[in-house]
Amino acid sequence: MSETFKNQQQILAKLGITTLNPMQEQALLTIPAYPNTILLSPTGTGKTLAFLLPVLNELKIELQQVQLIILVPSRELAIQIEQVIRDMGTGFKANAVYGGRPISKDKIELSHTPAILIGTPGRVLDHLDRKSFNLE
């Protein structure tokens, strides 16, 4: 049986979260059944955590390949999501790629094959064209 990431309570405890807000609770129930869910909520209400928890359940820790690509509109959001994933202590390697920094730095990080790639659309497409990572 494939090892998957299932310990949401441990993540919440690590982040110091004792209760989820209503939007987060609804997202945890909705996203597994409807993966194209859109979360609308004010800034600072925990949308990043709300969409990451159910999505991480689908990833396989033992796979050494990009399993999830998160496209974001800005470098700031890419950096934020990468940091949240690291803070969660999931064991999944995540890398953010975005314009405004040397593409050579991205390529070095991508050579270590993250499970999760977060990036702006243009930079992700650039890396696809350069074959910096494999989508198989």
Feature names for model-found ranges:
Residues P22, A50, I118:
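Short aromatic/basic micro-patch
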Residues E25-T37, T48-L63, I69, I79, ...:
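Walker A/P-loop NTP-binding motif
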